[in-house]
Amino acid sequence: VKDLNLEIPKGEFLTMLGPSGSGKTTCLMMLAGFETATHGDIMLNGVSINNIPPHKRGIGMVFQNYALFPHMTVAENLSFPLEVRKLEKSVREEKVARALDMVEMGGFKGRRPAQLSGGQQQRIALARALVFEPELVLMDEPLGALDKQLREKMQFEITALAHRLGITVVYVTHDQTEALTMSDRV
C-alpha cells in the first residue's frame, strides 16, 4: 500500500472497493494492528496508534470467516473481548445481553457456532465486534460466504445498525453493488 491518506469522520460508513490483491485487506490489517505500516502514522482521534497492540486499540473487527471460537457458546464468544479488558462479570453479562438484543439473537446465547446458520454466525460476529462499544469497526468482506438473499438482508441490517449506533465503519469488498448500497463513501 503506497501513499494512502485517508480521513474518516466519526459515524461514517466508508467502503474500500477494489479487486483481489489491491491492498484493501492490508489496509484493514494495518488499522487493526495485525500488520505494521512501514511509513507514516495511523491516527485514531488525533492520536497515533502505530505502537499500540491490536487488543488495546479499541477497534472491532468482523472477518470474512467470522472467526468465532467453536468451543465457546455464543455468550462466551461475546464475553471474550470483555474478559480481555478485565470487566466485571455483571458488566460483561449486561453488555453481552445488550449486544445480542441489538442483532436480534437474544435467545441464542447458549448455542455453539456449529448450531447456527451462516446468517446467525454473521450476526454473532457483528455483535462480538460491537460488544465493547468500539469507536471503529473494521469489516473484511463479512458477507462473502452468504447466499444472495441473505447477503442483501444483512447489507441493510449492518448499515441500519451502524447508523443507529453512530459508529464509524471501514468495510472492505470487491462487490460494487454492495459498496454502493451500504456506504456513505466509497
Predicted regions and their residues:
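Helical segment within the ABC ATPase nucleotide-binding domain
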Residues: E152-L165
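A short, surface-exposed alpha-helical micro-motif characterized by mixed small hydrophobic
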Residues: A179-T181
